[in-house]
Amino acid sequence: MLKRFVNSIWEICQKDKFQRFTPVADAIDTFCYEPIHQPSSPPFIRDAVDVKRWMMLVVIALFPATFLAIWNSGVQALVYGSGNAQLMESFLHISGFRSYLSFIFNDIGVFSILWTGCKIFLPLLIISYSVGGVCEVLFAIVRKHKIAEGLLVTGILYPLTLPPTIPYWMAALGIAFGVVVSKELFGGTGMNILNPALSGRAFLFFTFPAKMSGDVWVGSNPTKIKESLLAMNSTAGKSIIDGFSQSTCLQTLNSTAPAVKRVHVDAIASNILQMPHVPTESVIHSQFSIWAESHPGLMLDKLTLEQLQNFVTSPLSEGGLGLLPTQFDSAYSITDVIYGIGKFSSGNLFWGNIIGSLGETSTFACLLGAIFLVVTGIASWRTMVSFGIGAFITAWLFKIFSILIVGKHGAWAPARFFIPAYRQLFLGGLGFGLVFMATDPVSSPTMKLAKWIYGLFIGFMTIVIRLINPAYPEGVMLAILLGNVFAPLLDYFAVRKYRRRRI
């Protein structure tokens, strides 16, 4: 029956007035069966697995990230949009798998989560494939060439990079830009210099920044979520400082001014966590002993929020830590990021129980995809490993140099430099970009040496953009696109070195 359907399409396209639609018939035939033609250009695969099935393996590797995108977006939308402060408190105090499962089954429900998540993600996926497919077909008809299989991967990668609240027409515009400008104008699949999915996201990021950052990470209706958070904060009696919000780790990091120093964060952490020892405790205790003279009977780990703010924002001459009062909120928020408190715990960051772009939240899901891609030989483990090493070492060097240059354990260095290096690997889209974007075989280098340099460069640039550039909360997208630009040059020098060794 399927064969008769395919043959009928071929018969229609063989007629004179429908011959221009031959690429459509060829694409349907190739999708259902093996290719009927031999490739005339790369990639050449001498195997029973053709390019289409090779692309499908990448799609399979994306299954964990896709499922968790649906699951997590459903959970976050139901919790943040509930208007129930008690439900939010229960969610934020989840401390393990047992308590997480208890919360899911008793307070929300699996079906509600999946239904809500599907309503958020599936429309974006359908738009991505539909609009991208139309663009591919139009170019194939006009140029009279085959419809390539590249959209199989681009069509699912692209929606996974988007915030859940993105308007549908913007999502359509982004995938059209990615397919047309970054791929088809360069000659089609296999000829593009930049990653099409990331190019589409970058286009939206710079064209509609208000829809790609800020309060856009939960549910499908930002207004409803804002009203829900206001209701929850009002019910729970929360202030602006300790209230519920939908800020992400990287938003918190990016909004923290250099005026917020490590000593400010350590002082807040020693109070919140009642930690007897923090890296800058000598500076804190020295200042607190002066401040306490005018505030007798107070202990650092027993201060109320108002007293803590008073101590941290008092002038240095009065025994305080000299933070501007307007910066205390930022210092309080970044303390959660640096010390892994509440929703920013390392467990939440690793498993994906946080808000963010649809596919970037779960490092665990990305690792599952990485293992599959490496085992099947599709993605380069060298690029992945060097990317991770570059990011880790760069984050660690920021911390070490801050301590060495400033002294006193970096007490007066910007707090943003002291996020633990390993936590940088869990933040934002680093895991997703490392596994699925940086390893794109078309826009990344092909030589082994070039892959190592390419990964190290992207990892370095990711952390530099995150910690130094105040305009962009996330550095992965820009770092990978910049790496794509330099990939041919890296291959060129790698080949030159290889030839010299042979000579």
Swiss-Prot record:
Please indicate which superkingdom the organism of origin belongs to: Bacteria
GO cellular component terms given for this protein: plasma membrane
The alphabetized UniProt keywords are: Cell inner membrane, Cell membrane, Flavoprotein, FMN, Ion transport, Membrane, NAD, Phosphoprotein, Sodium, Sodium transport, Translocase, Transmembrane, Transmembrane helix, Transport, Ubiquinone
The subcellular location is: Cell inner membrane
List the transmembrane segments.
55-75, 94-114, 120-140, 161-181, 186-206, 361-381, 387-407, 417-437, 452-472, 475-495
> Which cofactor does the UniProt annotation name?
FMN
By its UniProt entry, which InterPro entries does this protein fall under?
Answer: NqrB (IPR010966), NqrB/RnfD (IPR004338)
> Which Gene Ontology terms cover its molecular function?
FMN binding; oxidoreductase activity, acting on NAD(P)H, quinone or similar compound as acceptor
Role of this protein:
NQR complex catalyzes the reduction of ubiquinone-1 to ubiquinol by two successive reactions, coupled with the transport of Na(+) ions from the cytoplasm to the periplasm. NqrA to NqrE are probably involved in the second step, the conversion of ubisemiquinone to ubiquinol.
Family membership, please give it.
Belongs to the NqrB/RnfD family.
Mind telling me what this protein is named?
Answer: Na(+)-translocating NADH-quinone reductase subunit B
Q: Which organism is it from?
A: Chlamydia caviae (strain ATCC VR-813 / DSM 19441 / 03DC25 / GPIC)
Q: What is the lineage of its organism?
A: Bacteria, Pseudomonadati, Chlamydiota, Chlamydiia, Chlamydiales
